[in-house]
Amino acid sequence: MKLPQPLFQGTLIRRYQRFLADVELEDGTVVTAHTPNTGSMMGCACPGNRVLLSKSASLTRKYPHSWELVQADGTWVGINTQLPNLLAREAILDGTISELSGYRQIRGEVPYGSGSRIDLLLSGERGLCYVETKNVTLVKDGVALFPDAVSARGQKHLRELMEMVRQGHRAVNLFIVQRADGVALAPADAIDPVYGRLLREAAQNGVEILAYRAEVTRTEVRLERALPVLL
């Protein structure tokens, strides 16, 4: 998936109020950028980090800049949580995610569960497949970890995926690791032990747990390979 161009390089001053970040651009201008990520962004929101921002052409946006990438531990990291659904759809269609091939239709944001919307609903002769995507930006010692903060929403999604399996459907929790230095994925038990317990319970009860790593450059984010999941 091509990133919007041009991207503006700068230095992170601070992230605050979850969705805002102050960035000093290369010309010395300080801008406030929208941060499309609700997580803690542990390890990715350190003052002084190099970041790349896109800029909307809209004249009505209060904050025209959006934070797209950050350089952490020497690698570019995609922090935009709106991308995983698009990346997953693209990778399903081009065959990269072979586990999810063979479906005729892909729909997004379909209501299901207890007031939730499934990220991707695949359908066809194989029946229905409910796919929940999760963006992963935290890596420690080569292992990508999720979540980076306690995630009641993520816990709820796992329970709903288990319910879909009980109803006879296929259900998949798909982790999208938007950085190239992760060699495996594991639940972040030290951060959210409840999520870790539920992820293992979901796997034991028929929910498929997949992880795919993206190649992230200044111009493109593209899923490239599956990662082992350590439960």
UniProtKB/Swiss-Prot annotation:
Q: Which domain of life is it from?
A: Bacteria
CDD domains reported in the protein's UniProt record: SfsA-like_bacterial
GO terms, molecular function:
DNA binding
UniProt xrefs under Gene3D superfamilies: 2.40.50.580, 3.40.1350.60
Instruction: Name the protein family.
Output: Belongs to the SfsA family.
Q: What is this protein called?
A: Sugar fermentation stimulation protein homolog
Q: Which organism is it from?
A: Geobacter sp. (strain M21)
